[in-house]
Amino acid sequence: MEKKDEGNPPMAVMGSRDENEDVKSTMRTAETMLRLVPVALCVSALVVMLKNTQTNDYGSLSYSDLGAFRYLVNANGICAGYSLLSAVIVAMPRAWTMPQAWTFFLLDQVLTYVILAAGTVSTEVLYLANKGDTSIAWSAACASFGGFCHKALISTVITFVAVIFYAALSLVSSYKLFSKYDAPVVTQSGEGIKTVTLGSPPPPPPPPPSNLHLHLHAKLACPAHNNSPN
C-alpha cells in the first residue's frame, strides 16, 4: 500500500505564501517609485518657473505677474509634497485598510485634476503670449520676451509629464480600492434573476421540507389509495 506523503501540502502552502509576499513586495516597490518620480518632476517645474524672470528694453516680466503661472507653482509644490508623503506611507510593509484605500483614491484623483488644471491654464497663457489676441488687447509678448516664454514652456511640459504619472497613480489606487470589494453575486430564483449588491453574502438556501409537508404531499399524490375501503 502506497504511503501518503503528508509533508507536501504544508510546504506548498508556505511556498504559496512566500510567492504572494514577493508579489506584494514588488508591487509596493513599483508603486513607491511611481510616487517618487512626480516629486522630481514637480520640483523641477516649480524651480524653472520660480526663476523665470526677464528684463530688457521693453520692461520686466516675471512669472508672478501672471496668475496662471502662480497657480502652476503652487500646484507643483502641493503635488511634490503629497507625492513624497504618499511614497513614504506606501513603502511601509503593512496591509491597507478600507479607509486608507479610500483616502488615497480620493487624494490621487484630486491631485491629478489639480496638476492637470495647472498645465492647462499655463498652456492657454503661453498660446496667447505667442499668438496674441487683438480682441482683448493681448499682444504677442513672446516676440519681446522670448527667454521668459521658453522657460515657461519647459515648466509647462514638465507639468504635463507629471500629469501622466498622476493618471497612472489614479488607476493604481482605483484598483487597490475596488479589488477589496466582492464581485456581484447573481442567483436564479423562481421569480427571475436576483442580483445581490457588492460585498453582500449570497442569499441562504430555502429550508428543507418538514415531515408534515412530506406526509401531506404523499397523501395528495395518492388520493385513490386514501379513499379505498378498509
Curated annotation (Swiss-Prot):
Q: Where is the signal peptide?
A: none
Membrane topology category: Multi-pass membrane protein
- Under the cellular component aspect of Gene Ontology, which terms does the record hold? plasma membrane
Cellular location of this protein?
Answer: Cell membrane
The record, for Pfam families, names:
CASP_dom
Taken from the record's topology, the Cytoplasmic segments are 1-29, 93-100, 173-230
Q: Which organism is it from?
A: Populus trichocarpa
Transmembrane ranges? 30-50, 72-92, 101-121, 152-172
Q: What is the protein name for this chain?
A: CASP-like protein 2A2
Q: What UniProt keywords are attached to this protein's entry?
A: Cell membrane, Membrane, Transmembrane, Transmembrane helix
Predominant location: membrane
* Subunit note: Homodimer and heterodimers.
Segments for region (Disordered): 1-23
Which family does the record claim for this protein? Belongs to the Casparian strip membrane proteins (CASP) family.
Q: Which residues lie on this side of the membrane: Extracellular?
A: 51-71, 122-151
